Amino acid sequence: MPQPIPKKRKTYTNNPRNAAISMVSSQHPLNVRPSGNLYLESGPASGATREELMGDFALFPEELLLEVLGFVDDAQALKNLSHASRVLYAYLYDEELWKKHYTQKAQAQEKEGVEPPKIKWRGSWRLSILGLDAQYEAKPQIPGNMLCSDVLFRPFQCSQVDYTSIFWRVIKEEELYHRDSLATQEPLDEVLPSGRIPRLPESSLTQEVFDKSWSNKPFIMTNSDSSRWPHWDLAALLERFADVKFRQEAVQWPLSLYSQYLAKNRDESPLYLFDCNSKAMQTLKSEYVVPEVFQKDAFKVFEKCRPDHAWLIIGSQRSGSTFHKDPNCTSAWNAALVGRKLWIMLPPDVVPPGVSTDDDESEVTSPVGIAEWVLSGFYNDCVNNTSAQIGITFPGECMYVPCGWWHMVINLDDSVALTQNFVPSIRLGNALNFMKNKKKQVSGFRPAEVKNALEEILAACQDDEDAETIRNWVRKFDELNLKENLQNEDCGELLESELPAMPILELFKLLLTKNGKTEELAKGLEDLAKLEKSELAKVTGKSEMWTKLTEAPSFSFGFALNE
């Protein structure tokens, strides 16, 4: 009997994925021009010069001028100054200046427990703070090349960026992968060219397969069932939670106000709704099911003292997050409910272009926003890095972000998403390593909640070194008599002078034991030891075996040089 011919799997072309960043910029509303235009002056200028129109302010470097203006907390004074000349008007037209003016006040009032003043959104921070309708906004034109300034022009250029045009190659390719993965319900992994993020059907991804093959690599989980994830578009959320306040980075606004901001703003980096503690989120958490392979979460043992880990995310087109690693060496999943998201990912040991860190990554500096990063060519540098993984999640798809991986996310559309951080049991060693060797970078834990958990575990555990460490910290906590705001502050925001590093590692080990996770803990500690040996070899350039050999009393190379 003839054997059936195996079905040939589709293959895909390795097309270039460079961004099309050679774009024509829109004209600035006040005719501010890029600095390079200074070299294109065609003839002698007529009328007052920039210096004359700025007076003594002309002595200030531009960055310093805007910094000084940022300290003025009287909106009317800023408005009056802007009327002194059309050049000063241009500097005081800067959206970031007015955004800081509002958010700094709002943050200070929030800390004091004072309700920030209500604001009616009018399409920009400047218009909203001054209470002006857009139809009455003056736009005096700067003549010729009188004001050529990248400080003013570049943020405007970034606020006009069209990512669907810039990333058209990637979008076209990812749309094909998305369609094919749903049509075939088969994994798209080995058949993809390098640098692409694989797609795996949720129905075929078992815990064993995840633990063995995928826990340390990014992938996109697909599901053809349209009811797999909640249908939470902005309109549906507004019907239910219009007056509920959500966290949007530096502010807490009702969803109705944020929706107006989302519909129209001029920000270079639009505000991102990233909320975990609103009344709405407490309700929404019960309306979705975590994918089965992500349910084995070692951090569950922290219970009441666990850092925030589940968020609703809403962002306008162009919003997103710059390169970062998720906290406490956790992994994450991110389900796109509305809108497309572009993901740029790099392994833990590959620092992204345009980002700098110190040796232990306690200080991460990314000097530019997302649009600036893309337009400056750093994205194209990433594409040319063979380690980079780039992909797009479409509504209904779920991205898996392995612990320690660098990732940047860009919203190509107005977007709604769900995300959770977790520690896969198979990656427990990574979390233990982080807690032991990067104590100062542990974040999200709140002292008062941790103290309660420590006291509870002390009452049930046997005396050992970990218990003694915990007991000493609890004693120190009581002696400090911390103010209530510090007791409930994220430990990552506290100085060591305010509170010694919390014994999170010791607590974690005892909680795992208490919850019957002794086998997982033993395996995690074994992996921790391997990670430490590997890190030591990187630092010293010597393996453990080499160190043992060279430390032996009778060690020699055994060369017979006299023969």
Question: Each PLM stretch: what is its role?
Answer:
Residues 2-398, 408-563:
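N-terminal accessory scaffold of Fe(II)-dependent oxygenases
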